[in-house]
From Swiss-Prot:
Protein name: Elongation factor 4
Uppermost EC category: hydrolase
Keywords attached to this entry: Cell inner membrane, Cell membrane, GTP-binding, Hydrolase, Membrane, Nucleotide-binding, Protein biosynthesis
Organism of this sequence: Chlamydia trachomatis serovar L2 (strain ATCC VR-902B / DSM 19102 / 434/Bu)
Catalyzed chemical reaction(s): GTP + H2O = GDP + phosphate + H(+)
Lineage: Bacteria, Pseudomonadati, Chlamydiota, Chlamydiia, Chlamydiales
Stored InterPro entries: EF-4 (IPR006297), EFG_III/V (IPR035647), EFG_V-like (IPR000640), EFTu-like_2 (IPR004161), LepA_C_sf (IPR038363), LepA_CTD (IPR013842), LepA_IV (IPR035654), P-loop_NTPase (IPR027417)
Amino acid sequence: MKPYKIENIRNFSIIAHIDHGKSTIADRLLESTSTIEQREMREQLLDSMDLERERGITIKAHPVTMTYEYEGETYELNLIDTPGHVDFSYEVSRSLAACEGALLIVDAAQGVQAQSLANVYLALERDLEIIPVLNKIDLPAAQPEAIKKQIEEFIGLDTSNTIACSAKTGQGIPEILESIIRLVPPPKPPQETELKALIFDSHYDPYVGIMVYVRVISGEIKKGDRITFMATKGSSFEVLGIGAFLPEATLMEGSLRAGQVGYFIANLKKVKDVKIGDTVTTVKHPAKEPLEGFKEIKPVVFAGIYPIDSSDFDTLKDALGRLQLNDSALTIEQESSHSLGFGFRCGFLGLLHLEIIFERISREFDLDIIATAPSVIYKVVLKNGKTLFIDNPTAYPDPALIEHMEEPWVHVNIITPQEYLSNIMSLCMDKRGICLKTDMLDQHRLVLSYELPLNEIVSDFNDKLKSVTKGYGSFDYRLGDYKKGAIIKLEILINDEAVDAFSCLVHRDKAESKGRSICEKLVDVIPPQLFKIPIQAAINKKIIARETIRALAKNVTAKCYGGDITRKRKLWDKQKKGKKRMKEFGKVSIPNTAFVEVLKME
């Protein structure tokens, strides 16, 4: 590492909506600062997962340290790359807390989008210096002046320092580097000598264990120090090594000092021991107060995951355990279902987080899985005054004991072209939304603020929004409060037996339509048996919808050539009695495809 000068350090982040060119600009910055040799360069270098490259999203934060010569001085530029999606907003807030500035990347053709808005507000709360960057300036559809006006009027940023760039051609990249040095303030000189370092991420390495990513606020951290975590007040650990991101994690001699970004390794074996947002200090000279802003990450969306082949249970257990090593937000609990066998109840930060985990299980571990419909945490207030929190229909108590139910609501911002306003209002009305306000973003686009139940968001809201706005709508949400709701348990009965895998918690207004659609779907996917099968949807034992799978017809009178009708009647009566007995004692075989199809629909 170069000689240490706190005034020559610049810590910054990049804020952008999906597909606005964040990872490509990061690539160009790495090239321009010669952080990586040309022969080792590849697209989206900081996005290490194939999934990140394919989807064009950042799932895990990737820091990198660059050096840049400017006016005879050598500067240390620490880029702390952040996930852009709303599911990871707490991680974003902690990454921003490690910075003094941020680049706001906006597509010069598409303009400001919902996700960039959400993260800009997080940066403004931290009082970061924000540099607007208009990317894709080389596109024929680029409207730099109109987009600048949007940023000024809607976000309230001064756009006099806006940089026009093209990550594709490299235009504007030197100006970005110079602006970071000129405009982003260096870290404040520490007021105390005790070690205080902010944990903004962690990573499990099979050889060295947990690598803890930190930004040092005061003091220094070096090999041999005995450290502890202030918010979690856990055990103490010896630092076995420190390192920097050049761009790969590289062990180094010396120490990490105030203002610097790097990582340390200690004898930590579980990511759960390391909480994002916690404060690291030494045991010998501990800091008096931890850094502000720490909170426990709690899952928001829950779903059951079961192997299609029950013999794959141990493989699934191993797969989830490995994924959890690098994902402290993923919670896992073993459960069993009468119809699906043994599986796991998993908690996620949101729908994107859930999709990523499902996709990684099938890709990296080659497993076929069934996932139950995503659910949220409901609050059940009982008549005896007790309060329960449930995320699984099987935990739903006897309705006679319930005083009332409450469900989580969210604040949603939707950005859309004006012509789709009525479509979005209809969609939000269907999802039980409450309109708070409507603002003009520019002469063509609107920002709609809504309150919606979280349960309506986690099902198919994103798909429907893209559908009604022809792909032009975008949204972000933040958790609000719990509100009373008429939430009930919908059960599906097949041949008069409840199938737990199809049970779900729904709002009373939607119960009948949901029950009917599940029954109709099951009629299509369950093959006919030798007897008639009733498929029913029920609420509190009251049937609200019914479909019937007709029996396979066998012609028992085929051998009677002519002859007396009484002979045929005897055979028909015998068949009827046999079918009745079969209906009482026969088991309906439900194929796996039926579960997959219905749960896909949910």
